[in-house]
């Protein structure tokens, strides 16, 4: 949990903005969304494999586009 100490003469809005930024950097909201509902291990593996396949397809498409001639 990120801790923010309110500085002297600092407005609430600025302190809240700093807190939100530190929470975003720590990845708290993403973690909460991921843990909101139980996900079976097989579902987790399927999702991770799908993202891996998508990443590889994107990389291959980029390499093929780089190697094709434009004339």
UniProtKB/Swiss-Prot annotation:
One Gene Ontology term from the biological process aspect of the record: translation
UniProt name for this protein: Small ribosomal subunit protein bS21
Superkingdom of the source species: Bacteria
GO cellular component, one term: ribosome
Segments for region (Disordered): 48-71
NCBIfam families for the chain: S21p
PANTHER family membership: MITOCHONDRIAL 28S RIBOSOMAL PROTEIN S21, SMALL RIBOSOMAL SUBUNIT PROTEIN BS21
Family to which this protein belongs: Belongs to the bacterial ribosomal protein bS21 family.
Lineage, highest ranks first: Bacteria, Pseudomonadati, Pseudomonadota, Gammaproteobacteria, Pasteurellales
Chain intervals with Basic and acidic residues compositional bias: 60-71
Example GO molecular function: structural constituent of ribosome
InterPro entries assigned to the protein according to its UniProt record, in alphabetical order: Ribosomal_bS21, Ribosomal_bS21_CS, Ribosomal_bS21_sf
Keyword vocabulary terms for this entry: Ribonucleoprotein, Ribosomal protein
